[in-house]
Design a protein with these regions (language model features):
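C-terminal catalytic domains of large/alpha subunits in multi-subunit enzymes
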Residues: 1-18, 23, 27-149
């Protein structure tokens, strides 16, 4: 069981043939929600370069969480106002959680790992927020509804 003001959320997806499970642990603070830890496991067949694998997974987690937290795409006359990365807030360095990565090797087939960590980040974070606060978030970015520390 988690302590008061704590939440844990889980999400799973298949992305590009890679099964990915992500767990997000948060704490509700006076300054907003702090993402403490992310645990992620990805079944990629064969991990060819463990250091690169670890870094790609962590980058995907940060990218996915940043979009869930802060990035909104708005339109004017059918054209997106945000035209590149500098148009998005993203996740700040001080908001970046500890990320624990496990690569599951269940075969000889090599699969890509750059994108698969991104899709489960938002639902895992939303589930953690729900677990901690009882507030169900169904629209991104989440900073429209909650503050992040």
């Amino acid at each position: 069981p988690l302590a008061e003001n704590r939440g844990r959320g889980l999400a799973f997806c298949m992305s590009f043939g890679v099964a990915t499970a992500e767990v997000v642990d948060i704490t509700v603070t006076d300054n907003g929600i702090r993402i403490d830890d992310v645990y992620i496991a990805a079944e990629v067949g064969k991990v060819v370069d463990p250091i690169n694998f670890d870094n790609l997974v962590k980058g995907g987690v940060i990218y996915g969480l940043g979009h869930a937290m802060n990035c909104e795409i708005t339109y004017s006359d059918g054209i997106a106002k945000q035209d590149n990365y500098w148009s998005h807030e993203g996740m700040r360095l001080n908001q970046t959680p500890r990320i624990h990565v496990v690569g599951l090797e269940n075969g000889n087939k090599v699969r890509g790992i750059g994108e698969p960590p991104v899709p489960p980040a938002a639902p895992a974070l939303a589930n953690a927020i729900f677990n901690a606060t009882g507030q169900r978030l169904r629209e991104m970015p989440f900073n429209k509804f909650v503050d992040f520390a």
